[in-house]
Amino acid sequence: MSSSEISPYLSFRDSARQAMEFYQSVFGGDLGISTFEEYQVSEDPSEQDKVMHSRLVTDNGMVLMAADVPNRIDLIPGTNFSVSLSGEDEEQLHGYWDKLIVGGSADMPLEQAPWGDSFGMLTDRFGVSWMVNIAGPGGGEGPTSGAAPS
């Protein structure tokens, strides 16, 4: 039986790597980091070293994820977090998406992503930002579902 995971996802302006390395020094565990360049998500040369996704998994199972926000997107302090839903159960995760979006809005449609998974972002009717990642055929190595490549 596959399971889904819910985790906090933090957003930063050019400091995700430093923040996640700090959190790793506090909580321990394994930290995976992927850059914009690795996933080819930006053509802006100044963004290639930015963190597209990072995932810290502590020895006791806590999970914290983070990324740098692209330059074209505003980052408002105090709203720099989302909730990530990820896993392999496509029907279950689509069901969560369908319920969460009622009265809310899709910020990015739930569709095929560059890393092979299905990915989407929405804001629910209470203003909470959600990211949904459904593992593709490769087994969930996408940004919000598995350990990012280092």
Regions found by a protein language model. Name each.
Residues L10-G61:
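Core segments of cupin and vicinal oxygen chelate
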